Amino acid sequence: MGDAAVPAMVVEEEEQEHVFRSRFPPVAVPDGVTVPEFVLDGAEAYADRVALVEAAAGGRSYTYGEVARDTARFARALRSVGVRKGHVVVVALPNLAVYPVVSLGIMSAGAVFSGVNPRALAAEIKKQVEDSEAKLVVANEVAFDKVKDAGVPVIGVGDRERMPGAISWDGLLAAADRTGAGVVPVDAAQQSDLCALPYSSGTTGVSKGVMLSHRNLVSNLCSSMFAVAPETAGQVVTLGLMPFFHIYGITGICCATLRHKGTVVVMDRFDLRTFLRALVDHRVMFAPLVPPVMLAMVKSPVADEFDLSDLALKSVMTAAAPLAPDLLAAFQRKFPGVQVEEAYGLTEHSCITLTHAAGDGHGHVAKKSSVGFILPNLEVKFVDPDTGRSLPANTPGELCVRSQSVMQGYYKRKEETERTVDGKGWLHTGDVGYIDGDGDVFIVDRIKELIKYKGFQVAPAELEAVLLSHPSVEDAAVFGVPDEEAGEVPVACVVRRHGAEEGEEEIVAYVAERVASYKRVRVLHIVDAIPKSVSGKILRRQLRDEFIKRMKPSA
């Protein structure tokens, strides 16, 4: 079907505003269902099909029958240890086949799932546990030593001997079996209840809990899956490499695939050989990736060790970081039969907001240089950051979105919520972009200045606070610069106190000891002063531009 048959993008002037809507018709969002009910609907018909399988040899797998069974068992188990509606349970697990079972079980119990990076520092995990007022933590051996002193009970998934004092996962499920499967709590989860509390740096650079309801996530799944062909149910194999503690990992990969009764091939960490072996052995069809992985597929000699001529891979999607045109071209030359799609999403909007190809039969495929088109049920506008006025097509402004997927707010942060979601329900993303006449959206800049290192968000303000805690640092600024492998890397400029003699390497090491590995400062310069505006705001753009200019080879 050609573009001529595709309905045009809808543009309306709403109270003198330029509001853009999807070129596709609205999709129905079922009332009254929770995320687990929506995702596992029809699981009994696929009871013997593998739903989740770990890519590593000998890894755990779950059939749909086992996912449904253990989700219900874990929900009962949580109730038995005192978890009630609205209680937060922090999950500090790496990507494992059991991860979706844990998260869906938490939601089924009426509780709130809050994923955290298991490889973050103990202090960072404890901060999230305390800020979210969590009642429990679920962890395995990777993070147990970091969470055991967080002040709440820990459910240990894995080797009990390596997690002394933890509540046994297996023992808890066995005890739940003895309570009976027919027990229904009087305060069962409702669609309007919160079900997830992921943490995001948002537009301010300070990590905070994003309150998402069952309705938020169900509506986002309905919009993002609008073009999935029903006849492919039970057939799609998706790679689960993106971290499951991230909203895209748990919703866009796990929940979407389980809803469609496909298989998620779970990978904990990226290793090129393991990754390529998973693509070949598991016949992966869809792989959400970050650009550094695609770069390795194109440039690493390891890829030549595999026969990639018969891959089942149909498409890859990048969403966590911009895709360089040169990398896109190189990837398409090496894998000409694989469609490359980009998407745009944010935690505050429950996941995907804009995407590329709509699928066979839906006609419109967004331009490669864009982040996609507006999904059904969404409204988008672009506003002048200074005046707040909405702008017509082809005019850059801050991207704002309104839909049923917009968060309920930031947890315990009313003022920040009001700055991010206005009185008319518009979510202000902090990203600058525009929409063209075909309805394709382009992101051209970021107001929020977050650094995206290998798909992970790194907040300059957080690193600046660590730098300023160093006794020899008087002032500091952090910004991101482009990097071929990582997407962006954090660079710091610091002003030393009078008489201080510490060098650049010593200060970099000081920061590295206090933050997760992906947040480390990669380059540091000693400077005389940090440029700031009249109001005292750091002029990161100026620093960034000057740094890039210095790094360019002279003609």
UniProtKB/Swiss-Prot annotation:
Residue numbers binding ATP:
S200, S201, G202, T203, T204, K208, E342, A343, T347, D431, R446, K537
- From which lineage does this chain's organism come? Eukaryota, Viridiplantae, Streptophyta, Embryophyta, Tracheophyta
- Which UniProt key words apply to this protein? ATP-binding, Ligase, Magnesium, Nucleotide-binding
Catalysed transformations (reactions) = (E)-4-coumarate + ATP + CoA = (E)-4-coumaroyl-CoA + AMP + diphosphate; (E)-4-coumarate + ATP + H(+) = (E)-4-coumaroyl-AMP + diphosphate; (E)-4-coumaroyl-AMP + CoA = (E)-4-coumaroyl-CoA + AMP + H(+)
Protein name in UniProt: 4-coumarate--CoA ligase-like 9
Xref: CDD domains: 4CL
Which family would the database say this protein is a member of? Belongs to the ATP-dependent AMP-binding enzyme family.
Annotated GO MF terms: 4-coumarate-CoA ligase activity; ATP binding; long-chain fatty acid-CoA ligase activity; medium-chain fatty acid-CoA ligase activity; trans-cinnamate-CoA ligase activity
Using the UniProt annotation, give all residue ranges assigned to the region (SBD1): 271-342
Q: What does this protein do?
A: Carboxylate--CoA ligase that may use 4-coumarate as substrate. Follows a two-step reaction mechanism, wherein the carboxylate substrate first undergoes adenylation by ATP, followed by a thioesterification in the presence of CoA to yield the final CoA thioester.
Q: What is the protein's species of origin?
A: Oryza sativa subsp. japonica
Q: Name one GO biological process term.
A: fatty-acyl-CoA biosynthetic process
Subunit-level organization: Interacts with STS1.
Which major enzyme category is it? Answer: ligase
Q: What is known of its domains?
A: Both substrate-binding domains (SBD1 and SBD2) are involved in the substrate recognition, and are sufficient to confer the substrate specificity.
InterPro entries membership:
AMP-bd_C, AMP-bd_C_sf, AMP-binding_CS, AMP-dep_synth/lig_dom, ANL_N_sf
Chain sites annotated for binding (E)-4-coumaroyl-AMP: Y248, A320, A343, T347, K448, K452
| Cofactor(s) this protein cannot do without | Mg(2+)
Q: Which Gene3D superfamilies match?
A: 3.30.300.30, N-terminal domain of ligase-like (3.40.50.12780)
Q: Where is this region: SBD2?
A: 343-410
Q: Does the keyword Iron-sulfur apply?
A: no
Q: Which GO terms describe its cellular component?
A: endoplasmic reticulum
Known EC number:
6.2.1.12
Give residues annotated as binding CoA: R269, K454, G455
